[in-house]
């Protein structure tokens, strides 16, 4: 299979008997596990292959291998799929179309609903809503499956207007708003129009290219569903919101001004303890924060580097995930092309480096664990592949399984058992 995995490739494999829904592997629950992979069409460090849309794979839980099931049709080839979220009921997949004008009306990006076929894991488009911002970079869903949150990144370049002040013409620069939008999930599983939108502070930070305005890059829910955390890499802010169960509003919590220039990007909550881990894109570091879901308070515990001290070339961390067992946290490095592994002290939240492992590809923009935590799947955007690693739950170490699949410009991996 070449780097440009297409529908033609899929049907060739089908004819060869290599893609068969009836032969899909069994997940631990007795259901079959499927992986859903987002592909970019445009963005920094674009990568290999003609990207766009979403690819579906069956997961062999004995080996961690991915077998192609389908790729979205030609109507989605221009869909710049930035991030994915699966409804906890396993019946719906939500995706961002990370563009500035999904409808050619310059009204920002979009969020799409796909219904997951409960027999073979395939997906079908079921609805679209505006994301309430430009370049929606992230989407997440709460544990009840009733609310979706979207982080809208905004452009790096401003719009330029000419205004007259006291009769004197002047140039005025207007940047897109960085926003966090909340969308209710309707009874049929599709998304309703946004019920609330938080507009991030219109300010700037250190870097004169990437930090001239707010850039919301992620928003995630704490396990109790009472608090959400949004990362603004443009202005070095971490925002918390109170989101009581059943509420469809974003009540302002606390705003943390991080160290200038570090660019907080993605977050991952500990499954049981009051810690959230945030990766910092411009500092090549990972921070642990302690939080109180009732008050939405948050405070810094520790920050650790994600690359070796002797590495001096360009690097920008991208993704972060706490292992399902809660003992380890992992971060991906674009540039060093690796995964940093840290052991978590459950009493304090402090991290100890376990090791740094190459991802066997370039630009690992995203990665994820299967729900059991047995395997880690690294999405190497730059080389257009997903590499499988076996996870040692006791030591946290990663071992390549030898399983690798070509996917055009992969940026996010999510799972559903059907």
Model-identified regions with their sequence ranges:
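Short loop/turn segments immediately following the C-termini of beta-strands
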Residues: 40-42, 98-100, 153, 233, ...
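A short beta-strand motif characteristic of beta-propeller blades
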Residues: 69-74, 125-129, 204-209, 252-257, ...
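Asp-box/WD-like beta-propeller blade repeats and closely related beta-sheet repeat scaffolds
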Residues: 124-216
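N-terminal secretory signal peptides and thylakoid transit peptides that target proteins
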Residues: 1-18
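Short, conserved, GDST-rich strand-edge loop motifs in beta-rich repeat architectures
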Residues: 38-48, 96-107, 153-174
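Beta-rich, blade/repeat-based domains predominating
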Residues: 78-88, 133-143, 202-224, 258-275, ...
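Short loop/turn segments immediately following beta-strands, especially the blade-tip
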Residues: 58-64, 115-121, 183-191, 242-248, ...
